[in-house]
């Protein structure tokens, strides 16, 4: 049986979700989003979920130990036995060290894009407040300006989808991820990948790149 353990790192708006979803489908392993895992714990009102909510409600970062515990619980599930794709984790060096000790990865993909590209992607996003459909002014525009194709409701933008906020988040990401990148580079597990362009098309290029080194990332169990 083949086992593949991957993590995707990258700044907000680089397309981690799109890449992860396609790789998950093609490799037949679960795509695990840290944000979704945290929200699930909150919605289920678990002990960990209550701890997470106590930090999130105050606008604070959730401590590494709590995030590690939630991720570890999910990775122990039976559907992760043959591999998984982590999206948005590890974010910090302590998280990476924890993961390497208990659930060592085969490869860590570093999705890279310029600040200009990230600003264009994020600031061009449009959302339907009624049905949740998403659009983009450049590559997925609605048929009528600012009107949802599905339900006819006026589209909106997120308040934090501004160039100033995106730039600040991008710089915060670079400062936080740098030790994690160095950690996996030293382990020989880092796969830098230029994510400039159509995420759907590039995801399959990434898949081919990973498959070309399958002897390194696919381990016979």
Predicted regions and their residues:
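Glycine-rich phosphate-binding loop of ATP-dependent small-molecule kinases
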Residues: 1-221
